[in-house]
Amino acid sequence: MVSSERSRWALLFADLEAQLAAGEAAEREGAVAELTRAEQAAVRWTDRLRATRGPVRVELSDGEVLEGRVAHLADTWMQLDAGGTRGRVQHVVPVAVVAGIVGLGSQALASQARTDRLGLGTALRALQRDRARVQVRTTSGQVVGRIARVGADHLDVVEVDRARPVDRVVPFSALLRVSEA
């Protein structure tokens, strides 16, 4: 009788140990899941875009879709190298007008380069210095010309394909993209 009682107690304590181990494992899994969710909550979509090496599909707020590879990503704008009917075309796109992206991986890469902090105006001034012919797409249409001036919150585009050049002011808030023309 003593031996069967010891067996019963051994089984009882073994069961308690198994329950405790299962509870601890569930607690660890819950903690890992919570840490994973907290880590994912801190990831910005631009950091995921920065880590992406392949082609992406960028949907703009007006419904236009651009496809290509990200050549540069700053905090407020990106340079997208896209294939088109005329070959490779480069676009400068404010990140604020991106409505969606297809092709992002799950990896993220935080901004570490000082150039990532350069504003949209800096990128546009580089195009102005080069006297590049650009297509400026806005929320109300598009203009082809050269960037004449870049202010704190706007750019001036001189439409050169007209009998008389027209100087158009485009607020950054209306800008969807600036592309090679």
Predicted regions and their residues:
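Short glycine-rich, low-complexity segments
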Residues: 1-67, 71-144, 148-181
